[in-house]
């Protein structure tokens, strides 16, 4: 991460921003080698779907076999925390300002969108990874794939 994100954001807001960022980030193959978001989002979605049933299974298995409840609860809590860790990482990433090279690339893509006649809201502050995700998603939907040749 280039610079530190705003530390005044609460934990719950970070998780919500992470979920929004996960939904916004374009899952395009061309971006996978450049950004870890595709892998983190896929692992987080998998964890959201699989880990709660796994936690319940772990608890019921230990209770049914008369095992110790403490390790079963610890395992269940760890399994449920994995998707939260992914959402937290995505939330922190979404509010992180872009490094200078990515900011330049962001402005180039934004300029191409404006040249093609797309209406974009004016930037009020330094671009973050969330604004990059918004612009990339719009560029993949509206522009041809040649805008990626600059990478």
From Swiss-Prot:
Pfam families: DUF412
Lineage: Bacteria, Pseudomonadati, Pseudomonadota, Gammaproteobacteria, Enterobacterales
Classification via NCBIfam families: PRK01816.1
Alphabetized UniProt keyword annotations: Cell inner membrane, Cell membrane, Membrane, Transmembrane, Transmembrane helix
Sequence intervals crossing the membrane: 46-66, 69-89
Protein name in the entry: UPF0208 membrane protein ECA3038
UniProt key word Manganese: no
Cellular component terms per the entry's GO annotation: plasma membrane
Domain of life of the organism encoding this protein: Bacteria
């Amino acid at each position: 991460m280039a610079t530190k994100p705003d530390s005044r954001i609460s934990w719950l807001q970070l998780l919500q921003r992470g979920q929004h960022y996960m939904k916004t980030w374009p899952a395009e193959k061309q971006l996978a080698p450049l950004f870890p978001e595709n892998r983190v989002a896929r692992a987080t979605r998998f964890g959201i779907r699989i880990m709660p049933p796994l936690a319940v299974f772990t608890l019921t298995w230990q209770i049914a076999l008369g095992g110790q409840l403490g390790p079963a609860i610890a395992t269940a809590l760890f399994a449920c925390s994995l998707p939260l860790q992914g959402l937290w990482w995505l939330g922190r990433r979404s509010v992180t300002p872009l490094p200078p090279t990515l900011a330049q690339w962001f402005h180039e893509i934004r300029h191409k969108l404006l040249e093609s006649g797309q209406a974009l809201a004016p930037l009020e502050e330094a671009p973050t990874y969330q604004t990059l995700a918004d612009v990339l998603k719009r560029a993949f939907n509206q522009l041809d794939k040649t805008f990626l040749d600059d990478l």
